Regions:
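Thiamine diphosphate
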Residues: 1-116, 129
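Short, exposed beta-strand "edge-strand" segments with a Pro/Gly-rich flavor and a Y/T-containing core
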Residues: 71-74, 131-136, 169
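Glycine/aspartate-rich loop-and-adjacent alpha/beta segment that forms the canonical ThDP
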Residues: 107-158
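Conserved small/polar residues in nucleotide/adenosyl-binding loops
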Residues: 166-173
């Protein structure tokens, strides 16, 4: 994001959001954010804080407050870290609150300075994660308006004037 802005200009990246996971951010992303502030970039970065290192098997990382053995350990505060790097615009959203996410992205893309959006929700693959109840589709109430399609859920589809919901067993079962 920052390199593209410097190479092509601010208008080129005005609607871009760089996305990085919490673990990868701590592994390789901190320096990039430092460079954004130092070089007066204007981009928006979204950190997906899911409280695990999903890409390698769901290990602990410095944002979880536990070490690799699951014992208590120091916890990196992502908001404080981003502010310490020089970001004035740091906000946290719940990715289940789509309206809040949309508002955050819209506002931060319009900002004239670099900004951070931390999307925080524990990974559904972590044991003990509290889940919202599963959704259901009431076919009798379906009007065929396709409003359900606007959330972008891959489990919801629309065929022959009917909203369909794909269900499968939970990977934790």
């Amino acid at each position: 994001l920052h390199g593209m802005e410097k190479a092509k200009g601010k208008d080129y990246i005005k609607n871009w959001v760089a996305v990085i996971g919490d673990s990868t951010f701590l592994h390789t992303g901190v320096n990039s954010l430092m460079n954004m502030v130092y070089n007066q970039a204007t981009g928006t970065v979204m950190i997906l804080d899911n409280s695990t290192t999903g890409m390698t098997g769901h290990q602990q990382n410095p944002t979880t407050g536990k070490n690799l053995r699951g014992e208590p350990a120091g916890k990196v505060d992502l908001e404080a870290l981003c502010r310490a790097l020089g970001f004035n615009r740091v906000r946290v959203v719940d990715p289940y609150d789509l309206a809040a996410v949309e508002t955050a992205v819209t506002e931060e893309l319009a900002a004239k300075e670099p900004s951070i959006i931390i999307s925080r929700r524990p990974c559904v693959m972590i044991k003990g994660t509290v889940h919202k109840p599963a959704i259901a589709i009431n076919q009798d109430a379906c009007k065929g308006c396709k409003a359900c399609m606007q959330i972008g859920c891959p489990a919801i589809s629309f065929k022959d004037k009917n909203c369909l919901l794909y269900t499968s067993p939970s990977p934790r079962d």
